[in-house]
Every structure is written in structure tokens, then in C-alpha cells.
């Protein structure tokens, strides 16, 4: 008998482990259980036979018996052993695709069970080590411990904004263009940096200054954390087998809508999903807590499309939904009661993006599928708004409205100079001056830029984002690049990429930017190469 290789042995162990797991979950009787619930039960069905009445023989000759034909039986019924039977040793997403295509050899019941497992969310508080089989808990904690150190704080971020606000004159255009002449990260190639399995829908650049941490989420609810390596690989071949340090975990059943960190504690991440879930990740202990599942009065989940912490109170979180609702909650109080009393309707359709005005924190801007950009005063309540077809929730007072030709994908406020940027499916970027205390009802842009930002089915929606410490914004380009502009519409940089880096995220304190594409990969641009050359 030929001896199995190490890889084949490991594969057999994985198959055995998966089959044992299915047995423990009692999945074998799932089909019978479903039949019983539907009222169709073959095992308990009794066949009522009619009594045979005695018949008088009439001398009829017996018909000749037909020789029995052998029935087809499966190898399992014949008692024959089949090698490599069970669920293949692949990821959940690959297994789902194989089941749908019929290439995995699984039965119909297996496909139904795969679908059921796929739609089962992570409930309650968990440790990442419980969801990641191939890494030990102590190794995971050691990997992210440096990001949990308190060597930086949200206070540093707000001090930077104050310093910018004290500057009377904007930097020269040439200096800005030099500052944002960024270089592509080259320790690993972008096609090696695969943070998640599917199309990226959210990215986040952690504010740590000592080390870089980039977090991404995809359409299947996976979260990927990339501990960026800054040291170049050795030229003597010692690091030939080294791969990017990426940790993947699945928390949600639908798109990851937003990733951020707590304003009061940057060692904790906050993640939200289209399935209505809001979860935290503690980088110090790698504990993930279930904060809430946003639901309406009928107990249906409301998909969270965007969230942002209040500038006035770091414990207050503002959120928008896929069906047009808005809510603000204090994370220190009981959340359930707040949702029922604070839920407002700001649109009859999806709100894809919203932003808080840093100079007037009681004002927010929303971009919606209803083809409008609206500015709201969330202090003022409006009962039964005339513009809405629904009568389920109260609304807020509308300050100003801009009507777009097509849907508005994103809105973002500049940190200091009262500029609001929006982009949409009409292939434009529009800049608005919102510094006045009395904005007109009909808002008009101060500048309109043509931009290739109409994404298709296979690319995430492109969204313009202002940098949090400078009046500079960036947006991905369908011609495979990241474009950077100042708040006056002057282009500062054009950073080419191999594919469309649709979902971008700024580092809040450094000139670093990351963009995620439709296959789960990340492009990272920094100014560190330029600085090293200047020092030399």
C-alpha cells in the first residue's frame, strides 16, 4: 500500500473532523424533521390494507412469474466503502458555491443545510480564537497587542483639527501636491494582500502611528485584519515563504457596512452590517461583543448602512439604515428603549451615506437612493412629514435640499472650511459651501467636477471621503486609480492601481490611504518612501 503524503494525511483528518462535526450536530435527520413539520412523514405513515374477501376459484390459470430485475442500489447500501466522502476541506464560501453548482457531490439535504448555516449569524459575545481554528488564542492576542496600547488617543486627533482651524491661510497648492505624491506599498504585491474572501464593502485605517493596521469587510460578512509589515523582505531568500499577516473572521451574514474605532477608546473597533448587527472587537483581548441588532416595530432587522460617533459626546452613536431610518443612541444606556423612542425617518429609500457637520454637530447631511442630498437639524422633531409616504416614524427638520439627476452615493464634510462633498451615479463630484447659518432651501453646488464614479454590479459604490485632519478628499476612479482633491476642487494626486480600489479609507493623522477592490484585496499608499529618500 502506498504511504500517504503529509498533505493527504492532513486532508483525511480534516474530512473526518468535518464528518464528526455533522454527526454531533445531528444533521443527518434534518430532511426527515422537515417532512414531519410539513405533515409528510414516511416513517410514521401506515398503509391501510383492505381485507381480502374470500373469492371462489374459477379455474383461472396462473400467469407465469416474471423474473425479478436487480434494483439499483447505492454503494452505501451495498456496504462498500467510499474514500473522501464528506464535506470538502474548503472555506464556507467555496463550499456554498460548490453546492450550488453541484460540483461538491453533496445531496439536496446538504445544500439546504449549507444555506441554513450560511444564514446563521454570530450571536452573543465571542472570542476571535473560537471562530478561527488554525490559530491559538495567545498568538492572536500577541499579534494585535501593540494596537491596544494607549500611546495614542482620540484627543490627539481633535488637537490636530484645532491646530488646522487656527491656521488662517491654506498651504500652497504645490506643497499639497508634494505632500500627497504617495507611493504604492511594495513589501508585498497587491495580489498577495487578500484581506477577505469576497468583494470589499468597508475599509478602516486604524489611527496607530507606530504600526499600521488596516481592517476590511466584505459582502459575505467576513472581517479581515492586516497587520502591515514595514520591514522589507530579505534579499538572501530567508523571507521567501513569508506572507502578509492577515487574520480573517466571519461575524455577519450580509455586507459589512461600516468599520470604525470607538472615539473614547481606539483599542476597540466597531463594525456594522446590513443584517442589522453592531459588534465591537477589543484588540487587547480579541473579545467581540454583540452590542445590538437594530430592529423596527415589527421586529424585522434594519440593515445598518452607516454610523458615526457624535462630535459633542463620544458615547453617542448616530446610525442610518437601508430603508431610510435614522437613530442616535447612547452606548452607556439601555439600548432597546432608546431605539424605539429615537428612531426617525429621513428617507423612503436607502440612505447610503451620512456625515455630521463638525462645526455644527446638530446638523447632518444624508445621501440617498431617492436622488437627494439633504441637510437636517436633528434637534427639531417633525411629526408626519409631508414628503414621506410612510406614517411609521417622526422625522427631523430639513435645512436644505439638493436634487440630483441620479442617486447620491456619498456625502462628507471637510474638517475645517465648511465644505460638503457629494458624488453619485451621474458621474459628478459636487462641492457645496455650507458655512452660512442660513442655508437656502434649494442648495446649489459651488463647483461641479466630472468624474468616472459610476460603478457597476461587480464593483462597490465609490464614495468621496474627506481626510479627518485636512480639507482634502479622495475618491476611487473607475479607470483604476485613487484621485485626491482639495476642498476647492484642485486635483492633488492620481494614484494608479491594477484594479478599481473602490472602497477607500484615510489614516486620520498621516498621509496614508488604502483602497479595497472587488476580490478582497487592498492597495496601500504611503509617503514613507519619499521621506526616506529625503533623509538620505
From Swiss-Prot:
Domain of life: Eukaryota
Coiled coil: none
GO cellular component: chromatin; cytoplasm; nuclear periphery
A GO molecular-function descriptor: DNA binding
Keyword DNA damage: yes
PANTHER family in the cross-refs: WD REPEAT-CONTAINING PROTEIN 76
Region (Disordered): 36-72
UniProt keyword list: DNA damage, DNA-binding, Repeat, WD repeat
InterPro entries membership: WD40/YVTN_repeat-like_dom_sf, WD40_repeat_CS, WD40_repeat_dom_sf, WD40_rpt, WD_repeat_DNA-damage-binding
Bias kind Basic and acidic residues: ranges: 36-45
WD repeat residues: 195-236, 251-291, 346-386, 403-442, 456-495, 496-535
Organism, as annotated: Vanderwaltozyma polyspora (strain ATCC 22028 / DSM 70294 / BCRC 21397 / CBS 2163 / NBRC 10782 / NRRL Y-8283 / UCD 57-17) (Kluyveromyces polysporus)
Protein name: DNA damage-binding protein CMR1
Secretion signal span: none
GO BP terms in the entry: DNA damage response; regulation of DNA damage checkpoint
PROSITE patterns: WD_REPEATS_1, WD_REPEATS_2, WD_REPEATS_REGION
Function description: DNA-binding protein that binds to both single- and double-stranded DNA. Binds preferentially to UV-damaged DNA. May be involved in DNA-metabolic processes.
The family this protein is said to belong to: Belongs to the WD repeat DDB2/WDR76 family.
Keyword Hydrolase: no
Amino acid at each position: 500500500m502506498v504511504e500517504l503524503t503529509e498533505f493527504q494525511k492532513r486532508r483525511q483528518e480534516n474530512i473526518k473532523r468535518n464528518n464528526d462535526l455533522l454527526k454531533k450536530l445531528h444533521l443527518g435527520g434534518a430532511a426527515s424533521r422537515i417532512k414531519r413539520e410539513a405533515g409528510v412523514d414516511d416513517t410514521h405513515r401506515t398503509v391501510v390494507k383492505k381485507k381480502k374477501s374470500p373469492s371462489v376459484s374459477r379455474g383461472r390459470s396462473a400467469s407465469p412469474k416474471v423474473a425479478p430485475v436487480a434494483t439499483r442500489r447505492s454503494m452505501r447500501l451495498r456496504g462498500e466503502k467510499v474514500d473522501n466522502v464528506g464535506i470538502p476541506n474548503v472555506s464556507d464560501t467555496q463550499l456554498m458555491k460548490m453546492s450550488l453548482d453541484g460540483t461538491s457531490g453533496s445531496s439536496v439535504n446538504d445544500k439546504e443545510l449549507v444555506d441554513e448555516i450560511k444564514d446563521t449569524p454570530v450571536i452573543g459575545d465571542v472570542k476571535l480564537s473560537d471562530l478561527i481554528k488554525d490559530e491559538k488564542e495567545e498568538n492572536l492576542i500577541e499579534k494585535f497587542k501593540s494596537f491596544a496600547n494607549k500611546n495614542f488617543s482620540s484627543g490627539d486627533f481633535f488637537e490636530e483639527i484645532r491646530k488646522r482651524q487656527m491656521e488662517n491661510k491654506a498651504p500652497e497648492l504645490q506643497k499639497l501636491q508634494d505632500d500627497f505624491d504617495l507611493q504604492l506599498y511594495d513589501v508585498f504585491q497587491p495580489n498577495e494582500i487578500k484581506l477577505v474572501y469576497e468583494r470589499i464593502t468597508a475599509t478602516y485605517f486604524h489611527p496607530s502611528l507606530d504600526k499600521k493596521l488596516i481592517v476590511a469587510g466584505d459582502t459575505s460578512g467576513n472581517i479581515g485584519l492586516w497587520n502591515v509589515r514595514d520591514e522589507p523582505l530579505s534579499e538572501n531568500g530567508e523571507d521567501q515563504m513569508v506572507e502578509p499577516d492577515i487574520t480573517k473572521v466571519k461575524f455577519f451574514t450580509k455586507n459589512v457596512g461600516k468599520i470604525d474605532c470607538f472615539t473614547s477608546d481606539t483599542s476597540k473597533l466597531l463594525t456594522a452590517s446590513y443584517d442589522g448587527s453592531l459588534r465591537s472587537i477589543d484588540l487587547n483581548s480579541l473579545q467581540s461583543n454583540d452590542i445590538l441588532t437594530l430592529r423596527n416595530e415589527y421586529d424585522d432587522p434594519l440593515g445598518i448602512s452607516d454610523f458615526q460617533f457624535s462630535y459633542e459626546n463620544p458615547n453617542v452613536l448616530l446610525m442610518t439604515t437601508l430603508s431610510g431610518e435614522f437613530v442616535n443612541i447612547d452606548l452607556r444606556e439601555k439600548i432597546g428603549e432608546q431605539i424605539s423612542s429615537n428612531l426617525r425617518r429621513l428617507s423612503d429609500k436607502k440612505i447610503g451615506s451620512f456625515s455630521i457637520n463638525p462645526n455644527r454637530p446638530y446638523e447632518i447631511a444624508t445621501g440617498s437612493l431617492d436622488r437627494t442630498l439633504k441637510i437636517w437639524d436633528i434637534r427639531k422633531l417633525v411629526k408626519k412629514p409631508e414628503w414621506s409616504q410612510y406614517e411609521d416614524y417622526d422625522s427631523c427638520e430639513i435645512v436644505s435640499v439638493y436634487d440630483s439627476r441620479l442617486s447620491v452615493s456619498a456625502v462628507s464634510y471637510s474638517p475645517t472650511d465648511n465644505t460638503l462633498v457629494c458624488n453619485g451615479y451621474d458621474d459628478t463630484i459636487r462641492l457645496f459651501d455650507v458655512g452660512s447659518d442660513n442655508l437656502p432651501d434649494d442648495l446649489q453646488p459651488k463647483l461641479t467636477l466630472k468624474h468616472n464614479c459610476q460603478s457597476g454590479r461587480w464593483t462597490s459604490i465609490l464614495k468621496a471621503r474627506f481626510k479627518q485632519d485636512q480639507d482634502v478628499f479622495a475618491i476611487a476612479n473607475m479607470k483604476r486609480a485613487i484621485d485626491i482633491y482639495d476642498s476647492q476642487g484642485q486635483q492633488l494626486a492620481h494614484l494608479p492601481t491594477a484594479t478599481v480600489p473602490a472602497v477607500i479609507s484615510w489614516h486620520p493623522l498621516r498621509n496614508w490611504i488604502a483602497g479595497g477592490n472587488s476580490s478582497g484585496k487592498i492597495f496601500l499608499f504611503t509617503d514613507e518612501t519619499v521621506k526616506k529618500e529625503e533623509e538620505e
